A protein has these predicted regions:
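Positively charged n-region of N-terminal signal peptides that target proteins for export
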Residues: 1-5
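Bacterial N-terminal signal peptides
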Residues: 7-17
Length: 168
């Protein structure tokens, strides 16, 4: 009987790590700042996933405590997140900064005020090179309502649609 209990406990203990983190999800919100009119991009990711990706990229352990951490993070985000205007021209986002707690990291970018983002193309490949199951959701909040783009390794870009839904 003791052997059966021991084996059952052993199985539970050995499967816990596999259950700990089985999904890979990132969230970006695009919205206008009501005070400045600037278009704000707020990216939220699991800190451990970002550290893992940047460690893999650099070939050494990445930590936000390192002197060059913000520069490395900025380069990685800039290389993997982009927007193109309706004319297909890549638009440079201004780096605002980042903050993190023990679980999450938030990265902030912005654009000067825009008439709208209708027809703009958004590309987000953050963490795709590290986790094949990564899903990046982009929420757009503006005068056209709230909507989302779902990006995966197979679908890395999408277009911001601004058609208001009719309530007929």
């Amino acid at each position: 009987m003791k052997a059966k209990v021991f084996i059952a406990l052993l199985v539970v203990v050995l499967t816990l790590p596999a259950l700990a983190h089985r999904y890979f999800f990132g969230l970006t919100e695009i919205s206008s700042n009501l005070n400045t009119g600037a278009v704000e991009f707020v990216h939220q990711y699991t800190l451990h996933d970002v550290q893992h990706a940047l460690s893999k990229l650099a070939g050494e352990r990445f930590s936000l405590d390192k002197e060059n951490a913000e520069a490395v993070l900025k380069r990685w985000v800039t290389d993997n997140f982009s927007v193109k205007n309706v004319d297909g021209k890549k638009v440079e986002l201004t780096w605002v900064g980042f903050e993190a707690d023990y679980q999450k990291i938030w990265v902030y970018q912005e654009l000067p005020a825009q008439k709208n983002l209708c027809g703009w193309e958004v590309s987000n490949t953050l963490l795709f090179d590290t986790f094949s199951a990564q899903v990046n959701t982009i929420n757009i909040v503006d005068e056209y309502g709230n909507r989302s783009l779902i990006l995966t390794d197979e679908n890395r870009t999408d277009i911001i649609n601004c058609q208001k839904e009719s309530k007929d």
